Amino acid sequence: VVRRVAVCGGSGDFLLDELAHSDVDVYVTSDLRHHRAGEFLEHDGPALIDVAHWAAEWTWLPVVEARIVDALGDRVSTRVSTHCTDPWQFRPVEPQESR
């Protein structure tokens, strides 16, 4: 049963020691180092979910934009880019004919 989830957008490796002594059941973040995450899990820390760095940060940008607009109204113009900067993009390719 998951009761409490901690989320850190971007690289959250630096919080593992703090989470080891918390009541968190699952930790969602990015860029976890292989050996560091393995050692953490060996000591019964929370379950780890390692998502793409870009995806972890991009999801909250519309929320930040809305807060800026709420605070500053028409004194500021905002726009959240839709340009994906994730270097880990995979696209299907057309099969090449055999020669």
Residue ranges with predicted function:
Residues V1-R99:
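Active-site catalytic microenvironments in core metabolic enzymes, especially phosphate/sugar-handling
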